[in-house]
Design a protein with these regions (language model features):
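N-terminal Sec-pathway targeting helices
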Residues: 13-28
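Mobile, glycine- and charge-enriched loop segments
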Residues: 23-27, 34-86
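Intrinsic-disorder-associated, low-complexity terminal segments enriched in Asp/Asn/His/Tyr and depleted
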Residues: 4-7
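S-adenosylmethionine/decaboxylated-SAM
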Residues: 74-79, 85-334
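Terminal export signals
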Residues: 1, 29-32
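Residue-level detector of alpha-helical secondary structure
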Residues: 9, 13-16, 56, 283
């Protein structure tokens, strides 16, 4: 009898303990929802985001004395404004990259800025790629700054995917100033991404084209990719934030988490269509470095835009014609 009574008392205690735990749990949940409701009643407050240093604006002033070494000659070669040249110089001087990649060379204006800024960086080297085989590609480096040639390798006549495995990985910094029309820089970024160090610095020129006269020519690619890449952004000082025309992104770690987003960015309406041999090179290249879902997105995007570009030809296709002299001829007439 005593044993039964003792057992009953223990059961009552256990029941009470369980009941107390459940009551506390319900109270905690109710309090949580009350707090959540009042915090979000009038919309979420993002004002605290100003304390998060996601954007740095000072690279154009960083060790600008290095840029002064070439300032007098660079105007003959570069299509960038002086503050943009200083910004590119500042990026190299601050981060001291050893392995740098450049996509889009023309006469070599940005190549000269990079090469000049990296001269005292031990074991540094610049690898530059341009689709064109025009004789003026890189001509300013060769003719005006030949003493920079020992730190420079130039690849021409094909898409970046053709050269990346030869150039190799562990790239610290990239500067892209290539097509501007979609897919342009979006496609370029996807090609180079597997070869970058985890927190590499990736720069783009003409990221302000969305509100300049270039808007009329749909030169949106650098603007799109610069803004969707996950990482800390660096922009020039002094400019209106909407018109800043050059910028760098210091990549977040684990970029593989975001590659599907980057491939989706290719899904817009392309303003030009690469030739079929280039498409095949890029497709086979992607198969080595990206998953099946990415490849499917690429194939579907190519299929759609092949037809779109046929029906909506863009007049300014000269940028992508590697056998044409029209870009340089057009520049000369200005």
């Amino acid at each position: 009898m005593e044993g039964d009574k003792f057992h009953m008392i223990n059961q009552i205690k256990k029941f009470n303990n369980i009941l107390i735990i459940k009551i506390y749990s319900v109270i905690i949940i109710i309090v949580f929802f009350i707090v959540f409701y009042f915090l979000n009643k009038n919309g979420r407050n993002f004002k605290t985001s100003k304390n998060i240093k996601s954007i740095e604006i000072y690279l154009d002033k960083y060790e600008e004395n290095y840029f002064n070494n070439i300032k007098d000659n660079i105007t003959k070669c570069s299509r960038m404004w002086s503050n943009q040249c200083q910004f590119l110089n500042g990026a190299v001087r601050k981060f001291k990259p050893k392995k740098i990649l450049e996509l889009g060379v023309a006469e070599g204006g940005s190549s000269i800025i990079i090469l000049n800024a990296m001269q005292d960086i031990k074991n540094s080297h610049l690898f530059s790629i341009d689709l064109s085989t025009h004789h003026k590609i890189g001509s300013c480096v060769k003719n005006i700054f030949p003493h920079f040639l020992n730190k420079w390798s130039l690849y021409t006549g094909n898409v970046a995917a053709k050269f990346m495995e030869e150039i190799g990985g562990d790239i610290d910094m990239v500067f892209i100033d290539s097509g501007h029309y979609e897919p342009g820089e979006i496609l370029d970024f996807l090609i180079i991404l597997p070869f970058l160090k985890e927190e590499a610095l990736v720069g783009f020129h003409d990221i302000g084209n969305q509100i300049t006269k270039a808007r009329e020519r749909n030169e949106w690619a650098p603007y799109i990719i610069f803004n969707i890449i996950r990482g800390k952004k660096y922009l020039p000082s002094g400019d209106n934030i909407l018109t800043q025309d050059i910028g760098f992104v210091k990549l977040e770690k684990n970029q593989f988490l975001y590659v599907h987003d980057y491939f989706r960015a290719l899904g817009g309406q392309w303003q030009y269509f690469p030739n079929e041999s280039d498409i095949n090179i890029i497709k086979e290249f992607f198969k080595k470095y990206y998953d099946k879902e990415c490849i499917t997105m690429f194939e579907e995007t190519v299929k759609f835009n092949r037809e779109f570009v046929k029906k909506n030809p863009l007049k300014t296709k000269y940028i992508y014609d590697s056998s044409s002299e029209s870009y340089f001829n057009k520049k000369k007439k200005k």
